[in-house]
Design a protein with these regions (language model features):
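C-terminal alpha-helix plus adjacent terminal tail
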Residues: 51-57, 72, 76, 80-143
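Crotonase-fold acyl-CoA enzyme core
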Residues: 1-91
Length: 143
């Protein structure tokens, strides 16, 4: 739900990854709609299909994150921004946020339904279960 909040702040050491295909799952969480809107089709495909890991700086450059802060100053930087938001009229903030979201609601609901149908299909197949079990076994072996 990061893209629906007022701001997305990341620690410099954070990384972002959607390894769906690695464990035999299709994208979910409306990522098939939001990722292309946020970072363009090529970058969205790179993340959703190949599971490419982005650094915090790369995520910021692609619009997935709004600001990146050093670990030592992260809390202080975020608190400054939270105080700024807290000083704003809450009705104005909520109504503005609703205006931004209202046009996307139906599109996101439809995307979520499609993604859930695909997940059911994958999870219900022998190949889908096999992929997930192989992924889990690799993780157990790494542990």
């Amino acid at each position: 739900d990061a893209w629906r909040t007022r701001g997305v702040w990341a620690n410099e050491k954070a990384w972002f990854q959607t390894p769906y295909t690695t464990f035999g799952q299709s994208p979910d969480g409306c990522s098939t709609v939001m990722f292309p809107k946020i970072m363009g089709g090529a970058s969205a495909n790179e993340m959703l299909l190949s599971g490419r890991k982005l650094t915090a700086q790369e995520a910021c450059g692609k619009g997935l994150v709004s600001q990146v802060f050093w670990p030592g100053t992260f809390t202080q930087e975020v608190m400054v921004r939270i105080k700024e938001l807290a000083s704003c009229n809450p009705v104005v903030l909520e109504e503005s946020k609703a205006l931004v979201r209202c046009n996307m609601k139906m599109e996101l609901e439809q995307a979520n339904e499609r993604e859930c149908e695909v997940l059911k299909k994958i999870w219900g197949s022998a190949q889908g279960m096999d992929s997930m079990l192989k992924y889990l076994q690799r993780k157990i072996d790494e542990f």
